[in-house]
Amino acid sequence: MSSRRSSRGSISEEEINELISKLQSLLPNSRRRGSSQASTTKLLKETCNYIKSLHREVDDLSDRLSDLMATMDHNSPGAEIIRSILRS
């Protein structure tokens, strides 16, 4: 698709609709709505809110992991498992 865009310099309405549909399918709440299509503005707002919630969740998990690592013996099997997961 990017090669089609670069040769024309613009994106078609059909391509935009396809991208919006793909975006909608990635949002957890959008799946529950079934086939009803949300407005593009609402969908973009939901996407931004979802991304923000994912950032908060990552931050929370990072804090929890830091707290856990601070209380563990750094030579324990649990600490080694966590380190190996973080390396992968």
UniProtKB/Swiss-Prot annotation:
Xref: Pfam families: bHLH_ILI
Membrane-crossing segments per the record: none
Record keywords: Brassinosteroid signaling pathway, Cytoplasm, Growth regulation, Nucleus, Transcription, Transcription regulation
UniProt KW Transcription keyword: yes
Subcellular location: Nucleus; Cytoplasm
Domain called bHLH: residue spans: 1-54
Knocked-out gene: effects: Erected leaves with reduced lamina angles associated with lower cells length, reduced internode length and small spikelets and grains. Impaired response to brassinolide (BL).
Xref: PROSITE patterns: BHLH
SUPFAM superfamilies the record matches: HLH, helix-loop-helix DNA-binding domain
Note: Plants over-expressing ILI5 produce increased grain size, caused by elongated cells in lemma.
Subunit structure: Homodimer. Interacts with APG. Component of a nuclear cell elongation controlling complex made of ILI5/BUL1, LO9-177 and BC1. Binds directly to LO9-177, and interacts with BC1 only in the presence of LO9-177.
Function: Atypical and probable non DNA-binding bHLH transcription factor that acts as a positive regulator of grain size. Involved in the brassinosteroid (BR) signaling pathway. Binds the transcription repressor APG and forms a heterodimer of antagonistic basic helix-loop-helix transcription factors that regulates grain length and weight by controlling cell elongation in lemma and palea. Contributes, together with LO9-177 and BC1, to the promotion of leaf inclination and grain size by modulating cell elongation.
Protein known as: Transcription factor ILI5
